[in-house]
Amino acid sequence: MVEAEELAQLRLLNLELLRQLWVGQDAVRRSVARAASESSLESSSSYNSETPSTPETSSTSLSTSCPRGRSSVWGPPDACRGDLRDVARSGVASLPPAKCQHQESLGRPRPHSAPSLGTSSLRDPEPSGRLGDPGPQEAQTPRSILAQQSKLSKPRVTFSEESAVPKRSWRLRPYLGYDWIAGSLDTSSSITSQPEAFFSKLQEFRETNKEECICSHPEPQLPGLRESSGSGVEEDHECVYCYRVNRRLFPVPVDPGTPCRLCRTPRDQQGPGTLAQPAHVRVSIPLSILEPPHRYHIHRRKSFDASDTLALPRHCLLGWDIFPPKSEKSSAPRNLDLWSSVSAEAQHQKLSGTSSPFHPASPMQMLPPTPTWSVPQVPRPHVPRQKP
């Protein structure tokens, strides 16, 4: 019941969010319409700034917007002024509010003494020859730009308003976020709403009728799987089990409870290997086992385990506290030459006693002994340091 109430609250919150979305859509619609009207007003004002604003052009643009039911186009100035005022008022009433200001600015009469001329008289160099033909003049008279702009269809953004959703169809509608997750959950199950006594009785029934409640039939298998498992796997398959060498250098099974992946034969049921049918084993040896024991560093006293073990590396490290102290570098022998430990006089006597009898008077030329195992030492030249 608590979950149903939470689900209902989530749905109500979803409807409230939808209402807020509709209000935002209306605000966007209004802002788009306002921006379109401002852009049209700016375009019309820019066009008027580009064209010369003379009394003749302003009067001609307004005379074209006059109704064609007039009998004379070239009337007196006073009559034309009155007609222009009426036309301007009617045009202001019919145009949208974005263009009313521009039409009012054009509808104001300007004082001029000469009669207004048509646009054809401004373009043609000889207007006097065509004044007598009223028919072609009316056909050639261009329409005003304001009338053309008003007839153009403006792009408008429309949003389809969704109707109120009844509560019955809430479950069938796609929700957003947590509402979609809550809607996908099946909370109307009859089993979950049962009391605890129902489940206790069900458990007692299953315990008393255990044989009837548990299915003892083998699982059905596809015919293709039966054929493949009976023919190909048993004949050509060889079970391979994986082992790993531990620190005591004994092979340990990697997965002792896992049977063979193909024939599903456990490791315990596999018979001993023979020469005719040997058992195949895959053994993996870690690199830490293959390292020699002298490369193992002595552990710190807190982290070193001093308990007895059969592992070779740890057994070699048990005597880390009784290692002999390291000798200093100054006392260590620099080479393995035996002549270095004998004095110079003893060397001279040894060489003179073993000299040859054929040349007793000849002086003995002693060659410096060449050390066989020593590293030749080259004297470094002494360079005096300069005082700064």
From Swiss-Prot:
The keyword Hydrolase does not apply. Ubiquitous. Isoform 1 is expressed in brain but underexpressed in glioma tissues, at protein level. Isoform 2 is not detected in normal organs, but is expressed in gliomas with increasing levels with glioma progression. On the contrary, at protein level, isoform 2 is not detected in gliomas, suggesting that this isoform is unstable in glioma cells. Induction: Up-regulated by IGFBP2. Residues 239-282 are annotated as: Interaction with IGFBP2. Residues 37-65 have a biased composition (Low complexity). Isoform 2 is degraded by the ubiquitin-proteasome pathway. Residues 138-152, 344-357 have a biased composition (Polar residues). Pfam families: MIIP. It comes from the Eukaryota. The modification Phosphoserine is found at residue 303. The modification Phosphothreonine is found at residue 141. Residues 32-79, 94-159, 344-388 are annotated as: Disordered. One of its GO terms (biological process) is negative regulation of cell migration. Keywords: Phosphoprotein. InterPro entries: MIIP (IPR031466). The keyword Nucleotidyltransferase does not apply. Inhibits glioma cells invasion and down-regulates adhesion- and motility-associated genes such as NFKB2 and ICAM1. Exhibits opposing effects to IGFBP2 on cell invasion. Interacts with IGFBP2. This is Migration and invasion-inhibitory protein. It comes from Homo sapiens.
